[in-house]
Structure formats: structure tokens, C-alpha cells
Curated annotation (Swiss-Prot):
It comes from the Bacteria. This is Bifunctional protein FolD. It holds the Pfam family THF_DHG_CYH. Catalyzes the oxidation of 5,10-methylenetetrahydrofolate to 5,10-methenyltetrahydrofolate and then the hydrolysis of 5,10-methenyltetrahydrofolate to 10-formyltetrahydrofolate. It catalyses: (6R)-5,10-methylene-5,6,7,8-tetrahydrofolate + NADP(+) = (6R)-5,10-methenyltetrahydrofolate + NADPH; (6R)-5,10-methenyltetrahydrofolate + H2O = (6R)-10-formyltetrahydrofolate + H(+). Keywords: Amino-acid biosynthesis, Histidine biosynthesis, Hydrolase, Methionine biosynthesis, Multifunctional enzyme, NADP, One-carbon metabolism, Oxidoreductase, Purine biosynthesis. NADP(+) binds at residues 163-165, 188, 229. Belongs to the tetrahydrofolate dehydrogenase/cyclohydrolase family. Its EC number is 1.5.1.5, 3.5.4.9. Gene3D superfamilies: Leucine Dehydrogenase, chain A, domain 1, NAD(P)-binding Rossmann-like Domain. Homodimer.
Length: 283
């Protein structure tokens, strides 16, 4: 059993991004990410601060827009339009969740697809499902980078993705399918789930339930990717996988914390760099 080290892989990605950003700066371009935070959600504030810190560490520009929770949808859309038209901005990220009075889909669709570094716009979703080049959501993209780094051959592999969200489950399935894997998409209500997961060589779990996947649900030698991050009443941070029981059966497994998590911000930086390069070519 080998534990996948997301921290070291993310550090490699960030080092590459930093070197590329320095090169772009020499031609007068600073890859820049604009982040919009609406409200005072503590978790969102933490995420936004970590994104800002990561940008600066990688020699990238960071523009923060902190709006009150009373901000109207029209005000938010107006800000997005300003950022869409600003040539100094390469990536636009709206931190989720948004207050209930704002239509999340309407906001995400307002972002210029060429600056949609989260990969949530319908244009980028369509490109991914069609196997075309666009922006891919950062968490599944980070998982693909981990699998590549650990030399996992996806051609013909039986893979199960547990979770059907637009942020992880669906794009993860598309990426694996595009890479030649044979895909099953399951979720917390799938019948006979253990039978399905035991047939798989690769299991990706993203259901948001602590210790959801147990040892009886995986085959010997399986590769298990845990996307979950859950805080127990005790304060302990755990994933969707019962790590202690599942890990001994695996050939590869991601821990929580330190597995998939660090890759998400690394790939956000990578997507922002990609946008800056694309925009430079189109000048």
C-alpha cells in the first residue's frame, strides 16, 4: 500500500506555475486571478485567503472583491461584467456558496468562459464532455494530475465515481472516460453499491459523508481517491473513506488531509496560467 502525497505533487505544480509566471512577466504579462466573496461565511473566508496567498507565492496577481451578504444579484453581475472586460484579469472565481437570494447558475453563466478558471460555465462543461480543450474544474483536474504522477494507466481500467455533483462527480467521470477508463457513476442512493465498487480497480469517492467507504466495499489492490473533507464532532478531520480499514487493501490511496485537497488550489493556479497564455496568444 502506497499513500499518495498530494502536498508534494501540488508543490511541483506550483513550482512549474511560478516559473512560467515569471517568464510571462518578462513579456509584460502577470497572470491575475480575481476572486469574489459575497458575505462573511467563515469557511469561504479561509478558502479565499488561501487562494490569495497561493497566487502571491507563485508570482501571480490577485484581486479580491469582498462584498456584503446584502449585495444584490444585479450588483454582482455588474461586477462580473467589469471583470470580463478587464484585460488585466485572466481568471474570475466566484466563491461558493452564494447567499440564497442570488441565483448561482445565473452568476456562473455570466462569467466569460475564457476566464472561467473554475470550469463551471456550460461552455466549458460541454467542451469537457466532448473531449475538447477548455477549463476543467480544479478538484477533478487535480486528481488526474495525481494519477499521472503515480503512473496509473487508465486505459481500460474499471473505475467507479461515487458522487454526481457538477463540481466533482460529473467532470471526474468525463475526465476518466476521455482517458480511456470504463466508467460507472454511482451515488449515496445507488443500490448494491458494494458490489459495484468491489468490481472496480479505481474508486473515487465524493459524497460528503464521513467514513462512507469501508473495507468491504473495495477489492484487494484497488486505487482509492478520497475527495471528502468532513469535520467530526470531536474536531477530527476525516474523508469519505474509512482510511484505517480501507488503506491496507489498497495499492494506492489518498489521505485526508494531505491528499486531494492541496491539488485543488494548485490546479486553480494552473488554470489561471493557462488563461493568461491563451490570452497572450490571442492578442
Amino acid at each position: 500500500m502506497q499513500i499518495i502525497d498530494g502536498k508534494s505533487v501540488s508543490a511541483k505544480v506550483k513550482e512549474y506555475v511560478k516559473n512560467e509566471a515569471i517568464s510571462l512577466k518578462k513579456s509584460g504579462i502577470t497572470p491575475t486571478l480575481a476572486v469574489i466573496l459575497v458575505g462573511e461565511d467563515k469557511a469561504s473566508q479561509t478558502y479565499v485567503a488561501s487562494k490569495e496567498k497561493a497566487c502571491l507565492a507563485c508570482e501571480m496577481g490577485s484581486v479580491m472583491h469582498r462584498l456584503s451578504k446584502e449585495t444584490s444579484q444585479s450588483e454582482l453581475l455588474a461586477l462580473i461584467e467589469v471583470l470580463n472586460l478587464d484585460d488585466s484579469i485572466d481568471g474570475i472565481l466566484v466563491q461558493l456558496p452564494l447567499p440564497k437570494h442570488i441565483d448561482t447558475n445565473r452568476v456562473l453563466e455570466a462569467i466569460d468562459p475564457t476566464k472561467d478558471v473554475d470550469g463551471f460555465h456550460a461552455v466549458n462543461v460541454g467542451k469537457l464532455s466532448s473531449g475538447l480543450d477548455g477549463f476543467v474544474p480544479c478538484t477533478p483536474l487535480g486528481i488526474m494530475e495525481l494519477l499521472k504522477e503515480y503512473d496509473v494507466n487508465l486505459q481500460g481500467i474499471d473505475a467507479v465515481v461515487i458522487g454526481r455533483s457538477n463540481i466533482v462527480g460529473k467532470p471526474m467521470a468525463s475526465l476518466l472516460l476521455n482517458a480511456g477508463a470504463t466508467i460507472s457513476i454511482a451515488h449515496s442512493k445507488t443500490k448494491n453499491l458494494p458490489e459495484i465498487t468491489r468490481r472496480a480497480k479505481l474508486v473515487v469517492v465524493a459524497v460528503g459523508r464521513p467514513n462512507f467507504l469501508n473495507a468491504d466495499m473495495v477489492s484487494d489492490g484497488a486505487i482509492v481517491i478520497d475527495v471528502g473533507i468532513n469535520r467530526l464532532d470531536s474536531g477530527k478531520l476525516v474523508g469519505d473513506v474509512d482510511f484505517d480499514s480501507v488503506a491496507p487493501k489498497c495499492s494506492l490511496i489518498t489521505p485526508v488531509p494531505g491528499g486531494v485537497g492541496p491539488m485543488t488550489i494548485a490546479m486553480l493556479l494552473s488554470n489561471t496560467l493557462k488563461s493568461a497564455k491563451n490570452r497572450k496568444r490571442n492578442v
